[in-house]
């Protein structure tokens, strides 16, 4: 999931970050320097821009510090934090599974038992406080309803000649929503059949993106017909970003129940970050009832069980997920298989096709 300010401005999206925020879509020599002495730095998977825009000014005013944000794909933000491990540049990390577990296992996160984690279910946080669910969400696919009149209902539907060269999904190595494609197909079909399916799906695939957020723009521009995504981001882009999008959930077989799983944004404190005191305060604030009550405004589900999924947008989330079967995911098993799955995807699915794997927004 990767969005930037210039992309938003170009395509009229509502997710325009405050002047105090910093967004970077590419990490490397051209990346924006995020840290300043009077700042707290947040590395975040994209999709939550409107929430940050709404809630961070109050934090900045109260604490007298700026919140500088670096936004990229969920795998990318962890990769950057890993590169910087010996000299951390960020204080707080927000990303998706399995990358939050990867960050924890790699020693990037510092245990911090925020008082506001107490209403997060035990299954939705690390026992030692290394991370906790910040915004709950669901994996989904998306179409442009103005163009794709016959909505795909099963995974097999995406293999139809009508979709040749019109499907795109994000790279599992760099995007949590991309890894989610492997997780869901493996859960429904079994691992070997899932990779056989994904190899067949390459006939329909136009390319793969480095993150997932840019796919919403490509869908709305009719450059592709179907893409992967997540419910919160897709609903928010449609309602607040002016994009023509409709989230869809696919079934394993004709007549079957559409199926998905929870794919939450999780938050954690980066070990030895330059401004840990303010990093802890930022986590406390983002997990407060005040902020969590605004999560439904961006079509997210509060991470805290004591904050209801309420309001008009909360009802839209409930309607979107109605009738969809939710399956559990063993994230420890995903972490154990992640490296093998990524290698198998590159070798067996992509192979020597020469297909692009890291498409990003045009410069």
Go through the PLM ranges and name each one.
Residues 30-36:
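Sec/Tat signal peptide C-region and signal peptidase I cleavage site
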Residues 270-329:
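Mature extracytoplasmic/periplasmic domains
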Residues 45-53, 72-76, 89-223, 258:
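Extracytoplasmic ligand-binding site segments that recognize negatively charged/polar headgroups
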Residues 327, 331-363:
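Conserved C-terminal helix/tail region of periplasmic/extracytoplasmic solute-binding proteins
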Residues 98-104, 220, 225-246, 300:
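A ligand-binding cleft/hinge motif common to bilobed small-molecule-binding domains
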Residues 54-68:
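Short alpha-helix C-terminal cap/hinge motif
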Residues 140-147, 183, 262-275, 294:
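A bilobed periplasmic-binding-protein/Venus flytrap-type ligand-binding module shared by bacterial periplasmic
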Residues 55, 154, 193, 197, ...:
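Short amphipathic alpha-helical coupling segments at ligand-binding clamshell hinges
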């Amino acid at each position: 999931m990767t969005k930037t300010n210039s992309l938003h401005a170009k395509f009229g999206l509502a997710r325009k970050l405050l002047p105090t925020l910093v967004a970077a879509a590419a990490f490397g020599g051209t990346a924006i320097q995020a840290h300043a002495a009077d700042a707290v730095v947040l590395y975040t998977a994209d999709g939550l821009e409107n929430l940050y825009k709404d809630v961070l000014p109050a934090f900045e005013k109260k604490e007298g510090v700026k919140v500088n944000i670096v936004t990229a794909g969920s795998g990318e933000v962890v990769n950057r934090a890993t590169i910087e491990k010996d000299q951390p540049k960020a204080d707080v990390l927000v990303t998706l599974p399995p990358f939050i577990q990867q960050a924890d296992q790699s020693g990037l996160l510092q245990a911090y038992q925020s008082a506001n984690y107490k209403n997060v279910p035990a299954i939705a946080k690390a026992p030692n406080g290394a991370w906790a669910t910040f915004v709950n969400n669901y994996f989904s696919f998306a179409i442009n309803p103005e163009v794709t009149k016959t909505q795909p209902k099963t995974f097999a539907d995406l293999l139809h000649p009508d979709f040749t060269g019109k499907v795109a999904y994000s790279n599992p190595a760099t995007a949590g929503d991309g890894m989610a494609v492997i997780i869901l197909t493996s859960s429904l079909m079994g691992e070997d059949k899932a990779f056989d399916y994904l190899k067949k799906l390459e006939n329909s695939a136009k390319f793969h993106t480095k993150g997932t957020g840019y796919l919403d723009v490509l869908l709305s521009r009719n450059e592709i017909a179907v893409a992967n995504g997540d419910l919160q981001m897709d609903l928010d882009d449609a309602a607040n970003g002016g994009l023509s999008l409709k989230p869809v959930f696919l079934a394993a077989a004709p007549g079957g129940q559409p199926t998905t799983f929870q794919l939450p944004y999780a938050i954690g404190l980066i070990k030895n970050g330059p401004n840990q005191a303010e990093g802890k305060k930022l986590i406390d604030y983002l997990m407060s009832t005040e902020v969590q009550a605004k999560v439904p405004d961006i079509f997210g589900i509060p991470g805290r069980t004591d904050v209801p999924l309420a309001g008009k947008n909360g009802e839209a989330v409930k309607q979107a997920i109605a009738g969809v079967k939710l399956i559990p995911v063993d994230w420890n098993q995903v972490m154990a298989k992640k490296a093998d799955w990524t290698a198998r995807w590159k070798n067996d699915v992509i192979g020597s096709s020469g297909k692009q794997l890291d498409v990003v927004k045009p410069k």
